A protein has these predicted regions:
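Short linear, low-complexity motifs centered on an aromatic residue
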Residues: 143-158
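Histidine-centered, metal-coordinating catalytic motifs and their short helical/loop contexts
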Residues: 122-147
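Amphipathic alpha-helical interface segments
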Residues: 1-124, 154-207
Length: 207
């Protein structure tokens, strides 16, 4: 039932010597499960939101009546809130994943990390502190009525726009873009698996 997850855990157990790094890899996998769940929910909720956006533009009083139009507007609002909630959790979990990865690399100091260094840098620029902080404090800003469509909104094309005194950022949450985290973790696990073949070369692993 949990074949993939079990295999991922085994790779870490068998190929990571540094105990602190091992704990960080476990935390990475926990946050990755959250990330994957949010990515699926986000995709589903965006599809529903776009459906109701389209339905509202096509409605008319003759067929649906005033209450039909209001019903579509309510669905729009509900799914907008769901998408924002999904984005907050997804971005936070991705930032935690990147933090775990960078700290694990710092603890291990292994040369094989060079294989994924460019991927780490690219993902780190996307899921940076500014984006994470903006989304984490979004609920508070909404409560204080400090957020408008100019500060935070997203498009049907799945682009999130964030702007305040500290942040001016666009975040692409299309499925292909979100797979960057999947690809990074997959390549890190491949990197760890390759250590089994090089176990005799202690200078390579430095552990």
């Amino acid at each position: 039932m949990f074949t993939i997850e079990t295999k991922q855990m085994d790779i870490i157990i068998e190929n990571v010597c540094n105990e602190k790094a091992k704990d960080l890899f476990y935390q990475m996998l926990i946050n990755y499960e959250i990330y994957k769940t949010m990515a699926e929910m986000l995709d589903e909720n965006m599809k529903k939101l776009n459906f109701y956006n389209f339905a509202k533009t096509q409605t008319c009083h003759m067929n649906d009546g005033l209450f039909g139009e209001l019903e579509y507007a309510e669905y729009q609002f509900v799914y907008q809130m769901k998408v924002i909630g999904n984005l907050i959790v997804l971005i936070t979990s991705a930032h935690r994943i990147m933090t775990c990865i960078k700290q694990a690399r710092a603890n291990e100091k292994c040369k094989d990390w060079r294989i994924v260094s460019e991927e780490i840098e690219k993902c780190d620029k996307i899921f940076d502190n500014k984006l994470r902080n903006f989304m984490e404090h979004l609920e508070e800003k909404v409560y204080k009525q400090e957020v408008t469509n100019q500060n935070c909104h997203f498009s049907p094309q799945r682009i999130l726009y964030c702007k305040d005194e500290k942040t001016d950022k666009q975040f692409d949450f299309n499925n292909e873009q979100l797979k960057m985290i999947d690809n990074l973790i997959d390549n890190i696990l491949k990197m760890l698996s390759a250590r089994k073949e090089k176990r005799g070369n202690l200078s390579h692993m430095e552990c």
